[in-house]
Amino acid sequence: PMVMPFGQMDSTLNDNPYLYQASVIDTITYKTVIDAMLDDCSDKHIVLLDLALRNKSDIQRMTYLKEEIAKRHLDASIVAYNAKSPQNFIDILKTDKENVLLLPTNAEAVVNTNIVSIASIIDQKKEAKVSLYGFCEWMTYSTIEVEVFHKLNTQLYSTFALDYKDPY
């Protein structure tokens, strides 16, 4: 048998019993991705956007983020963000350190609506440095405006990486 770890399902996989596709689902890897994000935030102000999430995996992400932020004693603010009235978001941005926005969802419409809203108001506090940390699934979205990703200094985290310094 041959393992095909990445890529789209196609007829080759369906028609050949000796081929199978192995890919790790997000519900298994989200903790690793969130840990990597938070490892990068020790000297930054985390702005965790609480979007009244209803999806089970998004709720798991939010819960894990809150637990880890508390456990690590990180500087963080949790904002009940609403794209229609975003002023409370601007008020909590700090000017003495970088603000890292965490949006714990993979729902394309939710991500797109909220980051477009944030990008449109971020200039109200030009002295605040802002970065958006996101999940690798965001790269597959068809409605995301690339300019918004750049304006928010977006970094996408993934478990699919090689550490060339690790000898094992």
Each predicted region: which residue ranges?
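Periplasmic-binding protein-like
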Residues: 1-6, 45-51, 79, 96-114, ...
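A short acidic, amphipathic alpha-helical/loop segment
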Residues: 36, 61-64, 89-92, 112-122, ...
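Glycine-rich beta-alpha junction loops
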Residues: 81-86, 106-108, 136-140, 162-163
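Flexible, charged surface loops at secondary-structure boundaries
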Residues: 39-42, 92-98, 124-128
